[in-house]
C-alpha cells in the first residue's frame, strides 16, 4: 500500500481515509439500491 511508501506520517491520514472510504462505499451501495 502507498501508506507504507509514504512512511509513518500517513498512518493517521490513512485511518481517516479508510473511514471516509467506508462511508463512501455505504453511500454508493445506497445509490445502487435506488
Curated annotation (Swiss-Prot):
CC annotations in GO: host cell membrane; membrane
Q: How does it sit in the membrane?
A: Single-pass type I membrane protein
Phosphoserine found at: 6, 10
Assembly notes: Homopentamer. Interacts with host CD4 and BRTC; these interactions induce proteasomal degradation of CD4. Interacts with host BST2; this interaction leads to the degradation of host BST2. Interacts with host FBXW11. Interacts with host AP1M1; this interaction plays a role in the mistrafficking and subsequent degradation of host BST2. Interacts with host RANBP2; this interaction allows Vpu to down-regulate host BLM sumoylation.
Family statement drawn from the similarity comment of this UniProt entry: Belongs to the HIV-1 VPU protein family.
Q: What is known of its domains?
A: The N-terminus and transmembrane domains are required for self-oligomerization and proper virion budding, whereas the cytoplasmic domain is required for CD4 degradation. The cytoplasmic domain is composed of 2 amphipathic alpha helix that form a U-shape.
Write out the function statement from the record.
Answer: Enhances virion budding, by targeting human CD4 and Tetherin/BST2 to proteasome degradation. Degradation of CD4 prevents any unwanted premature interactions between viral Env and its receptor human CD4 in the endoplasmic reticulum. Degradation of antiretroviral protein Tetherin/BST2 is important for virion budding, as BST2 tethers new viral particles to the host cell membrane. Mechanistically, Vpu bridges either CD4 or BST2 to BTRC, a substrate recognition subunit of the Skp1/Cullin/F-box protein E3 ubiquitin ligase, induces their ubiquitination and subsequent proteasomal degradation.
Query: Know the name of this protein?
Result: Protein Vpu
> Where does this protein come from, organism-wise?
Human immunodeficiency virus type 1 group M subtype B (isolate WMJ22)
The encoding gene = vpu
Amino acid at each position: 500500500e502507498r501508506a507504507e511508501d509514504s512512511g509513518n506520517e500517513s498512518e493517521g491520514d490513512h485511518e481517516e481515509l479508510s473511514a471516509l472510504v467506508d462511508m463512501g462505499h455505504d453511500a454508493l451501495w445506497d445509490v445502487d439500491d435506488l
